[in-house]
Amino acid sequence: MSVSAFNRRWAAVILEALTRHGVRHVCIAPGSRSTPLTLAAAENPAFIHHTHFDERGLGHLALGLAKVSQQPVAVIVTSGTAVANLYPALIEAGLTGEKLILLTADRPPELIDCGANQAIRQAGMFASHPSQTLSLPRPTQDIPARWLVSTIDNALAMLHAGALHINCPFAEPLYGDMNDTGLVWQQRLGDWWQDEKPWLREARRLESDKQRDWFFWRQKRGVVVAGRMSAEEGKKVAQWAQTLGWPLIGDVLSQTGQPLPCADLWLGNAKAVTELQQAQIVVQLGSSLTGKRLLQWQATCEPEEYWVIDNIEGRLDPAHHRGRRLVAKIADWLELHPAEKRKPWCVEIPRLVELAWQRVVAQRDTFGEAQLAHRIRDYLPEQGQLFVGNSLVVRLIDALSQLPAGYPVYSNRGASGIDGLLSTAAGVQRASAKSTLAIVGDLSALYDLNALALLRQVSAPFVLIVVNNNGGQIFSLLPTPQSKRERFYLMPQNVHFDHAAAMFNLRYHRPENWEELESALAGAWRTPAATVIELVVNDTDGAQTLQQLLAQVSHL
């Protein structure tokens, strides 16, 4: 009997089972223990293969692929700390709902806790963060193939959102020519190999019941809060709120067109808050809100009813309002709960919005970080997409810009870490094949610098704008101790990214004014390649501009 041959047949069943659940993208890191899984994926024509040498980046690449494709994405890594490097992407997927299938190769049980090389306790190592976990036994013909395939099917059928961790121990030898070992075992699955359906099919209902009193609540004074959602959902939500005559407070990731832009500015005005207190119901569609003032208002508002609608299960309201948590796809929920044409009830807020927008526009000519955030709409590629980093940049865009309705916007706003942002953006581009504008800060770029290797393989124009404000300037907005701020919070690195771009053979520009930036962008959008554009800005100007605007608008 050939151990290596049966390992591969066992792995082939696993990978083929994944294809029956919509898995098309497989992300693979180099490794020896994962050889059976890697070869099974490589030999399956149903897969699109992606490779990367860094498992942390690989996990985020898969996350980006899943964001766009809306299908589960598989990740294959070897044993040991390679597995641990998937943790950040796994956590993010658990909070934002992307489906990741983590296939982690492992040593067999007899090599765990005995000093064997590259052998750690992998089973259960991700604690409660995966939505589902599956620890497979060592491959053996004593276990029928139908058990293996139905076990995979069951786990995937139960996976509504987040990650499925499948730990796969393999004994040596891992290499060798294929022979007939296990062929009969494999063939007992019969014509399943030629079919396209799962061996075990399970139906899972995901739809919220129609709220029978909706006809009553839609006649009241309401507020719509729009969080993270798809581009199509964003357009539908905007139309729905407009028909109802309810003010729509749209997050940067809502893709609603933010009909009341600069919400993070005007929500700091007491007149706006007073008017919003008249709302009898708040309907929040989508989670992961960005703006600080929006979150502060959301935490203190006390409507008669607060509804949260999202297809992710669990509590998504950190303020714990009394109301309803409705698990449903946003578009489906809107169809069940049509709007009734009514006149807008807010009078003061539209006036404040116009005045706040005027204050922002008055600053747009200065070459700086806050002004870039305001202008970002002008730089979006036609028929393309935007990926927004975390920390200060996403807050500035949320507060100072107005993105087009239905324009695809992606970000990692679950755990909101700065790790893996470039890798995620690379995955977003690969899955969509669209022109992509990504914007991150300098520390975020440094954190994921080796992901520039992934940008060598883009299929359409890709522009990475690195806003270099020399450190974590988000902490300039927080009451961090002045005497310790630079060393222990900002951590300026005093670096530029020209050599990093050159190392990966990427085009690079460092514009010093808006005309040079627009010229660099015009050239970048004409070529299906990646371009790094570094904007070197004064360290604290972005944070100071936001604070000044907040002060101005609060006194309108």
From Swiss-Prot:
Q: What's the top EC group for this one?
A: transferase
User: Which InterPro entries has this protein been placed in?
Assistant: MenaQ_synth_MenD (IPR004433), MenD_middle (IPR032264), THDP-binding (IPR029061), Thiamin_PyroP_enz_TPP-bd_dom (IPR012001), TPP_enzyme_TPP-bd (IPR011766)
Q: What does the entry comment about cofactor binding?
A: Binds 1 thiamine pyrophosphate per subunit.
The catalytic activity, as recorded, is: isochorismate + 2-oxoglutarate + H(+) = 5-enolpyruvoyl-6-hydroxy-2-succinyl-cyclohex-3-ene-1-carboxylate + CO2
Question: Does Manganese show up as a keyword for this record?
Answer: yes
Q: Which UniProt keywords apply?
A: Magnesium, Manganese, Menaquinone biosynthesis, Metal-binding, Thiamine pyrophosphate, Transferase
Under Enzyme Commission nomenclature, its number is: 2.2.1.9
One Pfam family per UniProt:
TPP_enzyme_C
What GO molecular function annotations does the UniProt record carry, in alphabetical order? 2-succinyl-5-enolpyruvyl-6-hydroxy-3-cyclohexene-1-carboxylic-acid synthase activity; magnesium ion binding; manganese ion binding; thiamine pyrophosphate binding
Biological process annotations from GO: menaquinone biosynthetic process
Names of the cofactor(s): Mg(2+); Mn(2+); thiamine diphosphate
**Which pathway does this polypeptide act in?**
Quinol/quinone metabolism; 1,4-dihydroxy-2-naphthoate biosynthesis; 1,4-dihydroxy-2-naphthoate from chorismate: step 2/7; Quinol/quinone metabolism; menaquinone biosynthesis
Task: Enumerate the PANTHER family for this protein.
Answer: 2-SUCCINYL-5-ENOLPYRUVYL-6-HYDROXY-3-CYCLOHEXENE-1-CARBOXYLATE SYNTHASE, PROTEIN PHYLLO, CHLOROPLASTIC
HAMAP family noted in UniProt: MenD
* Protein's job: Catalyzes the thiamine diphosphate-dependent decarboxylation of 2-oxoglutarate and the subsequent addition of the resulting succinic semialdehyde-thiamine pyrophosphate anion to isochorismate to yield 2-succinyl-5-enolpyruvyl-6-hydroxy-3-cyclohexene-1-carboxylate (SEPHCHC).
Similarity section: Belongs to the TPP enzyme family. MenD subfamily.
**NCBIfam families in the record:** menD
Subunit organization: Homodimer.
This chain's protein is named 2-succinyl-5-enolpyruvyl-6-hydroxy-3-cyclohexene-1-carboxylate synthase
Annotated gene: menD
